Amino acid sequence: MIRMTLLNKHLIHRNVTFRDADDALKSMATAMVENQYVKPTFVDAVIRREHKFPTGLPTGGIMVAIPHADWTNVNRGTISVATLEKPVLFKNMGNPEEDLAVRLIFMLAVSEPHAEVNLLRDLMGIVQNQATLQGLLDAPTDLDLFKRLEDMFQDIVVDKEKKEETSK
């Protein structure tokens, strides 16, 4: 089993503003490239995938999106998180005709085939809790947001087939 530290302070964005979903995806993915978690191809791949298979989730009062791209574009697994000052419209995963005003984005980069299924399952348990999401939006500092996320993700299992490993 692999347990990874999936978070990097440089990939946590608090109270940011984006023009639209594509701007958010490009900005977050570019930060992943700059920190060598993903290949440059990840930027276009995550945008293309979002257009074809939307990731907006109607999770209640605070909507989220969980964009991701194929593992072949990833060097090392990570999660980038953005809390948005103003909502950005993402298409609903279950109804692509519907726009959702998203306030939280969890961008996934998974380096193992099929590992994203486990990560998505674990993440779904987190994003369905409105109090948890509100706590992320209310984080008063970048460091506080990072610590809250670190607590949330400390036991996320990425791949059940491998030996225990930690990377940062």
Predicted regions and their residues:
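Cytosolic covalent-transfer regions centered on His/Cys nucleophiles
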Residues: 1-168
